[in-house]
Amino acid sequence: MIELTIIEKADTPAAWLEQFKAYAGIADNAQDSLLQAILSKAVLSVQQKADRSLIACTFELYEDEVEGNAVRLYQSVSQVVSVKHEGNGVAYSFIGRKVHVAHSPETVTYKTEPHLADIDTLLPIVYQYATALYDGEDSKTLASILSQC
């Protein structure tokens, strides 16, 4: 079983909210808190589907069946914070998107950092997805939008 949990995430840039509102044709500021929540959900959904970071996050990855003592990390990894087995820190090497250890780790905590090219590519999909959420589109439409990632 693999379990990926967001421990901490950066806020979406304020400019993204204004760009989303322009994309969706929303002129007033009365719903900004709702729109910000929708935008945050869209950002997290798109970055999960694309497996690339749009905002900096700290993740905790739990994996109970590691093959070959290598754990694949998700999204745009910038730093491994800790690797633990049965609650104790273990030595590891970090190569590419994988953490290699002498024996199976249970938990890897790591940070991600977005890349400008990923933001440029994925932000239009975020706005499209957020607009669909705002408009109450069905799950089939939402899945179709995410398939563009």
Set out the residue ranges of the language-model regions.
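Divalent metal-cofactor coordination and adjacent catalytic microenvironments
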Residues: 1-149
